[in-house]
Design a protein with these regions (language model features):
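N-terminal chloroplast transit peptides
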Residues: 1-20
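Non-catalytic interaction-recognition regions
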Residues: 20-21, 26-155, 162-166, 172-642
Length: 642
């Protein structure tokens, strides 16, 4: 058993305190959603509870799955079957249940009633609990159960969302405590474009999981420990002997300070020896070295926070130093379980299928990333009680995480193979940011692109385009300087984020300001302007939307109204898919499709001045509400006027 170390770490204000998280309220799923076997009557009761719960209904897919689960348990009580419900193309209906073929293959020759997949599908339909959400069902082909949703129910669902809030459309996820490890820059180094993907992908995953009612720990595992600090501290002492008196002026530009110390470390063997001695003295806890380390960490943290503030990202720092005191106990536990072996002077864990072992103690007796990561995982599982731990890094670290997770499974910390079992870990890998030349994105002088400079340029370009648009339309006088600044930031930073998030994270993508700031196509600019246009439609109607919510009624009478309504109510399942598969681009695709479907609706259905004005204004408002929630989940500020 690993106890809490007497000294948790050499603490610093940059690494903050070491609070133990209290166990938050868990979100309990109905048993039908958790996989526990229910009698048909109980399953039907669970379905009714989900559908009628005024606070949280889950996705349409989840609600339909509960109905079909009840039917499958009633029709085939001897089989343990999970319903396979998915959205389908319009010519077949709105959704499909695709269990029949699989069930029939299990029942071949064992049932006189179910002679073919089609009869299985008909049996499933016959035992469906009654529900207002389903208008029609039919069996097609080899047993596919086609489902048509009730337009009246769809309209009521949208109206309920407008009355009770978008939170009622949050999906139901099985994990209740999730830790997302993302961003994680190194102390004393400036954040660059390479940190962009981890920061915004991790932030979006955290936002989606929080919306889905998980308790989320946003963890910044900064590199605040290791040999580089001996180099930095020794350079500080030798260059500015009076560093304590002159304060931060001694360090100045932290990036330049790092480069200068690294140059000495690489070129001066005597300095290198002194730097290595400084590491030993720091790790032994000498006050002078600890104070210098604190000072460097504090300066770095403030610079990081300026970037996070601009990106709207919130993180809690628990750096490498926090977990350092836990490493000996964790390694002792792993050794007692027979996992750690000696190999060529190092202590290692051999992983099945891997030629190279996972090194946990180096030849010189020092710790490394693997030993720190194992200690961090132990802490996160045993102290913070996380159900799901997600690591957001580049794909180049995939092998490390494969081996690291395998070691944790061998230790019995994680389930061996069942991907649905908890606790679990996931590595969210992502590709490179490329320049126009197809190579890693760098400045003309081959330096990495500083994230601060990139954000500055995004805002400045956005502001220039906005000013040009307003001057051409004659609306510039209607805007205050503050509105211009905030809108330029929203569009500029949003464009940078969306250009990244709309891509499958595993792929590389080419960074182009011209493309991401284009107001046509699948860009943040286009989507933000689309949202602003919807807000303008509502304003120009002269109607108070809050009054309409109380007295009006949505009717999905026109084909394009129904298409838009159907896409709106699929919001929750798209968030669910994005969370489950850890793919933010799923939400981006949904948002872009929503804008497209609204455009078609607006082109074919007159809103202001029509007989259906109230209903259609409410549909406009529902679209704007869902778009705003999508923007929020993607970390993008909405724009209300253009």
């Amino acid at each position: 058993m690993i106890g809490t170390p007497a000294v948790l770490s050499i603490s610093s204000s940059s690494c903050r305190s070491h609070p133990l998280f209290s166990s938050g309220k868990r979100t309990l799923l109905p048993r039908a959603m958790s996989g526990e076997t229910l009698a048909p009557a109980a399953a039907a009761a669970v379905q009714e509870q989900i559908v009628q719960d005024g606070n949280r209904v889950g996705s349409v897919k989840q609600q339909l799955s509960s109905l079909f689960e009840a039917s499958l348990r009633a029709t085939f009580p001897e089989l343990n079957i999970e319903p396979m419900v998915a959205a389908c193309t319009a010519k077949f209906g709105d959704y499909q249940c695709n269990n029949a073929m699989g069930i029939w293959s299990k029942l071949k020759g064992a049932s006189a009633e179910f002679k073919n997949p089609k009869s299985v599908g008909q049996g499933i339909i016959s035992n469906l609990p009654p529900s207002e959400m389903i208008e029609s069902t039919s069996v097609a082909g080899p047993g596919f159960v086609n489902i048509g949703l009730s337009s009246t129910w769809m309209a009521q669902s949208i109206q309920n969302m407008l009355s009770n809030g978008i939170g009622t459309w949050a999906p139901l996820l099985p994990a209740s405590r999730v830790l997302v490890d993302f961003s994680s820059p190194n102390i004393a180094k400036e954040m660059h474009v390479g940190h962009l993907r981890s920061t915004i992908i991790g932030d979006t995953l955290a936002r989606m999981l929080e919306f889905s009612n998980a308790e989320v720990f946003r963890r910044n595992h900064v590199g605040d420990w290791g040999t580089q600090f001996g180099m930095l501290i020794q350079h500080l002492f030798e260059t500015f002997p009076n560093w304590e008196d002159i304060g931060e002026q001694a360090i100045g530009d932290l990036q330049e300070f790092y480069k200068a110390s690294k140059k000495r470390f690489d070129e001066d063997d005597l300095f290198k020896e002194r730097a290595q001695e400084a590491v030993v003295r720091l790790q032994s806890g000498e006050d002078k070295y600890r104070d210098a380390w604190k000072r460097i960490c504090e300066i770095s943290r403030r610079e990081f926070d300026l970037v996070y503030e601009r990106l709207g990202v919130h993180l809690e720092v628990k750096g490498e130093s926090f977990y350092n005191p836990y490493i000996p106990g964790v390694l002792e536990e792993l050794s007692s379980k027979g996992l750690i072996e000696e190999s060529e002077g190092a202590r290692v864990i051999f992983i099945e299928g891997q030629q190279i072992p996972l090194i946990v103690v180096k030849r010189d007796g020092g710790y490394n990333y693997a030993s720190t990561d194992l200690a961090a995982l132990w802490y996160r599982l045993n102290v913070e009680k996380a159900d799901w731990i997600i690591y957001v890094t580049d794909v180049g670290q995939s092998l490390h995480f494969t081996m690291f997770f395998s070691a944790a499974k061998r230790a019995g910390w994680l389930p061996d193979s069942n991907i649905k079992a908890f606790p679990k870990t996931s590595h969210v890998g992502f590709g490179l940011v490329l320049g126009s030349d197809g190579k890693r994105f760098r400045t003309r002088s081959s330096e990495v692109v500083r994230l601060v400079e990139l954000l500055d340029e995004a805002k400045n370009r956005s502001k220039a385009e906005l000013l040009k648009r307003l001057e051409e339309s004659g609306k510039l006088a209607e805007w205050t300087d503050e509105e211009l600044e905030k809108t330029a930031e929203a569009i500029g930073y949003g464009a940078v984020k969306y250009a990244d998030l709309k891509n499958n994270r595993l792929t590389n993508y080419t960074f182009s300001f011209d493309q991401m700031l284009n107001d046509k196509g699948n860009t943040a600019v286009y989507l933000l302007y689309a949202h602003a246009r919807i807000c303008s439609i509502i304003r120009k109607s002269g109607k108070e939307i809050e009054d309409l919510k109380k007295t009006g009624r949505i009717v999905l009478g026109h084909a394009d109204e129904r298409i838009l309504g159907l896409h709106l109510i699929r919001f929750a399942e798209n968030v669910e898919e994005a969370c489950t598969n850890l793919l933010p681009n799923v939400l981006c695709e949904y948002l872009y499709d929503l804008s497209d479907k609204f455009s078609r609706f607006y082109a074919s259905c007159q809103v202001v001045g029509s007989a259906e004005e109230t209903s259609r204004l409410l549909l406009c408002e529902a679209t704007a509400v869902v778009m705003r929630k999508c923007f929020h989940l993607l970390g993008i500020q909405p724009v209300y006027k253009i």
